[in-house]
Regions:
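Short loop/helix-cap segments at secondary-structure boundaries that form the rim of catalytic
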Residues: 83-89
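N-terminal Rossmann-like FAD-binding beta1-loop-alpha1 element of flavoenzymes
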Residues: 1-10, 124-133
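Residue-level detector of alpha-helix initiation sites
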Residues: 16, 122-124
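Beta1/beta-strand and adjacent pyrophosphate-binding region of the FAD-binding site
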Residues: 111-122
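Short glycine-enriched, charge-decorated loop/helix-capping segments at active-site entrances
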Residues: 24-29
Length: 236
């Protein structure tokens, strides 16, 4: 838009621009100064960044129209990790992996202690597990539904996880958080025998006779993200 002569304004809820590139991706995968350099180029092109402003809460789209803004492009991404809908999923020490990454990148969380279990075999699961290692976790175990060779993260990320000392447990689905005094003390799993049905759709099947329990004080789940609209579109 700036290159075509417009003067776009980016409203950012966080204290700095960059979105998931700055707050969701670990520095060992994408250095923050690279993103900051790209943002500086955008500023030179005439893009204005207004940080610490949550549209829908601090200012509405209707109010922005009154201020003279004529067009709106919503690019909030899939920034919510949702909830872990199993018994004990709201215990202390259990949180979405993407929220954990945000805390680390914004320097709200610098260290971890005790044993950590990461749920999810995708790229975010790999990022979260490797970040947990760097935050000082005693041990990190990663569990996923898929078979070892079918993990969505791929061979490269899986190998990087194992080089970092992460133990991969493929073919397991979580059933319950073990809670002691309101805090996470472990996670129970059952064997996953199949992830997709004959039509290729997600329809996991399990063998309830095969189970195991992982001890941990922190459980980080990375099982999909969704849009968190909040009050963004109120009045539109």
């Amino acid at each position: 838009l700036a290159e075509k002569g417009s003067r776009p304004t980016v409203f950012e809820r966080e204290a700095r621009p960059g979105g998931m590139l700055m707050n969701g991706i670990p520095s060992f995968r994408l250095e923050k100064d690279v993103v900051e350099a790209e943002i500086d180029i955008l500023r030179e092109l005439g893009v204005e960044f207004r940080c610490g402003v949550e549209v829908g809460k601090d200012v509405t789209i209707a109010q922005l129209r009154e201020q003279g803004y004529q067009g709106f492009y919503v690019a909030v991404g899939l920034q919510s990790g949702g909830k872990l809908n199993i018994p004990g999923g709201d215990a202390d020490g259990v949180m979405a992996g993407i929220d954990f990454m945000r805390q680390v990148n914004l320097h709200e969380k610098k260290t971890l202690s005790g044993k950590v279990v990461v749920i999810g075999g995708g790229n975010i699961g790999a990022d979260v597990a490797r970040t947990a290692v760097r935050c000082g976790a005693e041990s990190v175990d990663l569990y996923c539904l898929e078979a070892y060779d079918d993990m969505p993260m791929g061979e490269e990320d899986r190998s990087e996880c194992e080089r970092d000392g992460i133990t991969v447990h493929a073919g397991w689905g979580q059933t319950e958080i073990v809670v002691e005094d309101g805090k996470c003390a472990g996670i129970r799993f059952r064997k996953c025998t199949r992830v997709k049905n004959d039509e290729g759709r997600f329809a996991p099947e399990f063998d309830d006779s095969v189970s195991e329990q992982a001890e941990c004080t922190t459980g980080l789940y990375c099982i999909g993200q969704k849009v968190d609209w909040r009050e963004l579109l109120t009045g539109t």
